[in-house]
Amino acid sequence: MIRKEMIAMLLAGGQGSRLGVLTKNVAKPAVLYGGKYRIIDFSLSNCTNSGIDTVGVLTQYQPLKLNAHIGIGKPWDMDRIDGGVTILSPYLKAEMGEWFKGTANAVYQNIQYIDKYSPHYVIILSGDHIYKMDYSKMLDFHKENHADATISVINVPYEEASRYGIMNCHENGKIYEFEEKPKNPKSTLASMGVYIFTWSTLREYLIKDNECSDSVNDFGKNIIPAMLGDGKSMWAYQYSGYWRDVGTIQAFWESNMDLVSRVPQFNLFDPEWRIYTPNPVKPAHYIASSACVKKSIIAEGCSVHGTVINSILFPGAYIEEGAVIQDSIIMSNSRVCKNAYINRSIISEQAIIGEKARLGEGPDVPNEYKPGIYDSGITVVGEKSSIPADAVIGKNVMIDIGASAVDFTSLNVQSGKSVFKGGVAE
């Protein structure tokens, strides 16, 4: 029997619907971030840097890019015979088989995988947060308190606390109450979605939860309240570093912009805590004499002939002469043609912005199609789409994946409008 002290179960099956067109064809953890990474790289790198060498990645929604990205885990030193990284998708069994119904059910369906390593502890992680954390220190805290469960928490502003699961604790950190998105929170200690459980205890509760017909099979809504109700030893591990849930267009854009601030809140260049990812086979970036670059991240394989200010260019982005990019994210292998102007926009992979096109101008009007998603003044262009020359695109505009010139009924797309491939929303 292979014995591991602690293994990780990384939840990476979420759609991330609040990211709109960015997650239409890809799971949220596989969305590009920070000039060369995908969001899941941060949790995987935390595991590597914390000495965790066995990780089960639980996938479900649109897993193709995520699976290809992780591969056999080599960038994270997880291409191992004993342990390493394993992709765990829903599958049919002789007696049953179904989609993961919730976070707890996803882990329950993989009890056999966990039992294979007979761990003392299991850490449950979300694959869609941006942060750097040493899980070994959290494990030490768990052991010192003889805990059944330890939940990592972070202080959030009071006005934002109702968006999170809130832990109410004694002064020593022992949890006495958990509130899921309370209207009137009693504290500001928000769950980060990072849990360490003593495996024998968690295993028992997963089985009980699966047998409960009215459970939604969720850690926050079912497992944690059940353990608290039974008087289990549960502790809050307070984290004080950078942590972002990039689950909305605004949060995603702001977190990327944090990387190019004068003094970045989140340091990607820390040699003591590297963020690992598969490296693209591309040459060094090229900055032409006609270019002007200020406060920006320029990845491998980029060619810059225009102006780039306070922006992020992913590998293979091509910025032609006269083009101006400001406060924007240009993802891999996209091209911005001559004299185009882009402001406060997210341009997905392999998109083309035509000559003299202008994006991100006009009044800040919420999107008519999905006002709760595109409402922060940021225009989003889907992958493999093409913006025609001379087009003027307003704020909070959504350009669908694969949209082209034939899908534009007008070259003037006003703020809050959308352009769909084929002209019709799916």
Curated annotation (Swiss-Prot):
Gene Ontology BP term (one): glycogen biosynthetic process
Gene3D superfamilies to which the protein is assigned, alphabetical: Hexapeptide repeat proteins, Spore Coat Polysaccharide Biosynthesis Protein SpsA, Chain A
Keywords attached to this entry: ATP-binding, Carbohydrate metabolism, Glycogen biosynthesis, Glycogen metabolism, Nucleotide-binding, Nucleotidyltransferase, Transferase
InterPro entries per UniProt: ADP-Glc_PPase (IPR011831), ADP_Glu_pyroP_CS (IPR005836), GlgC_bac (IPR023049), GlmU/GlgC-like_hexapep (IPR056818), NTP_transferase_dom (IPR005835), Nucleotide-diphossugar_trans (IPR029044), Trimer_LpxA-like_sf (IPR011004)
Coiled-coil boundaries: none
Biological or metabolic pathway of the protein: Glycan biosynthesis; glycogen biosynthesis
Kinase listed as a keyword: no
Catalysed conversion reaction: alpha-D-glucose 1-phosphate + ATP + H(+) = ADP-alpha-D-glucose + diphosphate
GO terms of molecular function: ATP binding; glucose-1-phosphate adenylyltransferase activity
Principal EC category: transferase
Pfam families the UniProt entry points to: Hexapep_GlmU (PF24894), NTP_transferase (PF00483)
Binding locations of alpha-D-glucose 1-phosphate: 165, 180-181, 191
Catalytic activity, EC: 2.7.7.27
PANTHER family per UniProt: GLUCOSE-1-PHOSPHATE ADENYLYLTRANSFERASE (PTHR43523:SF2), GLUCOSE-1-PHOSPHATE ADENYLYLTRANSFERASE-RELATED (PTHR43523)
Cited function: Involved in the biosynthesis of ADP-glucose, a building block required for the elongation reactions to produce glycogen. Catalyzes the reaction between ATP and alpha-D-glucose 1-phosphate (G1P) to produce pyrophosphate and ADP-Glc.
Family membership: Belongs to the bacterial/plant glucose-1-phosphate adenylyltransferase family.
Assembly, per entry: Homotetramer.
Protein's name in the database: Glucose-1-phosphate adenylyltransferase
Organism expressing this protein natively: Ruminiclostridium cellulolyticum (strain ATCC 35319 / DSM 5812 / JCM 6584 / H10)
Lineage: Bacteria, Bacillati, Bacillota, Clostridia, Eubacteriales
